[in-house]
UniProtKB/Swiss-Prot annotation:
Task performed by this protein: Bifunctional serine/threonine kinase and phosphorylase involved in the regulation of the phosphoenolpyruvate synthase (PEPS) by catalyzing its phosphorylation/dephosphorylation.
Catalytic activity: [pyruvate, water dikinase] + ADP = [pyruvate, water dikinase]-phosphate + AMP + H(+); [pyruvate, water dikinase]-phosphate + phosphate + H(+) = [pyruvate, water dikinase] + diphosphate
Residues reported in the UniProt entry to bind ADP: 152-159
Entry annotated with the keyword Kinase: yes
Organism, as annotated: Pseudomonas fluorescens (strain SBW25)
Protein name: Putative phosphoenolpyruvate synthase regulatory protein
Gene Ontology molecular function, alphabetical: ADP binding; ATP binding; phosphotransferase activity, phosphate group as acceptor; protein serine/threonine kinase activity
A Pfam family the protein falls into: Kinase-PPPase
Keyword Zinc-finger: no
UniProt family annotation: Belongs to the pyruvate, phosphate/water dikinase regulatory protein family. PSRP subfamily.
Alphabetical list of NCBIfam families matching this protein: PRK05339.1
Key words of the record: Kinase, Nucleotide-binding, Serine/threonine-protein kinase, Transferase
Class of enzymatic activity (EC top level): transferase
Length: 272
């Protein structure tokens, strides 16, 4: 079965999309065609949106699922005339919160993502810059300022994990690729020894690593199964020998990997 799903907002759409994606992921037997529609902030845009939803309903033979975070009541009422199943995120959660807190909501558009109301903005930018500056072992003399240092073979997911933790939580994460030379010495590189308490290892199944590396350097020694299997085996041995906590990234999303790392290392998010 295939259904259409719309994430509609009068702001960036991040909240509607994030919550909507999480809910739809629980229905593994249904394929969803997903459409994010940010900045639906006028009556005219809302009417055009209704036309899109109705066209999708006619094409699919099922009414689309709509997740919205629209603040304006007039716009919400227009969207409600569409041939879609509407889940109004704000009205679902704000009313009981207002009752519990004995306080009326401000009903402000884009409140959670605006720079002016987000004291975490600069923290996020600094963390992203740190992750980029300290990517792939390019620099090691700022490791004293790192919250975490991810280590593992090349192409096992270190960079996207560092960037995700920087963007989402303000974590200053560096990463260092362990090479064949490092494995031959049977010990941590000198640049990492002084920061062993910050290290967390990522490993990966050799066949998955082979597929990833073949996209970058096909038919090379670097991407051969034998080389990938050797590197993964030796790095896992190093992790055990040096007592470095680690996880296999093969079957986890970057979100899951990041959450597991923070729990395992006990690192507090700079913002939540």
């Amino acid at each position: 079965m295939k259904r259409s799903a719309f994430f509609i907002s009068d702001g960036t759409g991040i909240t509607a999309e994030t919550l909507g994606q999480s809910l739809l992921a629980q229905f593994e037997n249904i394929t969803f065609a997903k459409f994010t529609r940010p900045y639906i902030d006028s009556v005219d845009k809302a009417r055009a949106m209704v036309q899109q939803i109705n066209l999708a309903a006619e094409k699919d033979g099922f009414r689309p699922i709509i997740f919205d975070t629209i603040v304006n009541q007039d716009i919400r009422e227009i969207l409600a005339t569409s041939n879609g199943f509407m889940i109004d995120i704000f009205s679902t959660f704000l009313a009981p919160l207002e009752q519990e807190l004995s306080e009326h909501s401000s009903y402000s558009v884009g409140k959670s993502h605006s720079i002016g109301h987000n004291s975490n903005y600069m923290e996020r930018i600094e963390a992203v810059n740190f992750a980029l500056d300290n990517d792939d072992g390019a620099r090691t003399h700022y490791y004293d300022k790192a919250d975490l240092i991810l280590v593992g073979v090349s192409r096992c997911g270190k960079t996207p994990t560092c960037l995700y933790m920087a963007m989402q939580f303000g974590i200053r994460a560096a990463n260092y690729p362990l090479t064949e030379d490092d494995m031959e010495h049977l010990t941590l590189p000198a640049a990492l020894r002084a920061h062993s308490h910050k290290l967390f290892g990522l490993t990966i199944d050799p066949d998955r690593l082979t597929a990833i590396r073949n996209e970058r350097k096909p038919n090379s020694r670097y991407s051969s199964y034998a080389q990938c299997e050797f590197e993964v085996r030796e790095v896992e041995n190093l992790f055990r020998r040096e007592n470095i906590a680690h996880i296999n990234s093969t079957h986890f999303s970057v979100e899951e990997i990041s959450a597991k790392i923070l729990v395992e290392k006990g690192v507090e998010r700079r913002f939540k």
